[in-house]
A protein has these predicted regions:
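Structured catalytic core of nucleotide-sugar glycosyltransferases
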Residues: 1-114
Length: 114
């Protein structure tokens, strides 16, 4: 299993497109994966945008009612991935940014390196 961990705060303009591109990437490069998103106290429409994707993608959203910061969001996502794995020596986690700082088009190359 590959866990894509995405911390986000007020990423309404980009998070939907990112999830769509991740889906397209894994259609062309099939792997078992799960997307874990931390919505870190967003005050925009981030939560509303994430909701429909949870119905069509292997997506879990962790919502913080108030902002805790990037490091705590990453820690929470990695802990969630560790708690979910039943193959810790085989599974991996990749941290991505919701603003396309790390584009999904690089995922196949990253996964091949694992």
């Amino acid at each position: 299993m590959l866990y894509l961990c995405i911390p986000s705060h007020n990423e309404a303009p980009t998070v939907g497109l990112l999830l769509w591109k991740i889906r397209k990437t894994f259609q062309a490069f099939p792997r078992e994966y799960e997307i874990l998103v931390a919505d870190d106290g967003s005050t925009d429409a981030t939560a509303d945008i994430l909701e429909p994707y949870a119905k069509s993608l292997p997506l879990t959203v962790l919502r913080h009612s108030e902002r805790r910061g990037y490091a705590r969001s990453v820690e929470a996502l990695l802990r969630m991935a560790v708690d979910r794995t039943d193959r810790p020596k085989r599974d991996s986690a990749i941290i991505m940014h919701a603003d396309f700082a790390h584009g999904p088009e690089y995922l196949p190359d990253i996964i091949r390196q694992l």
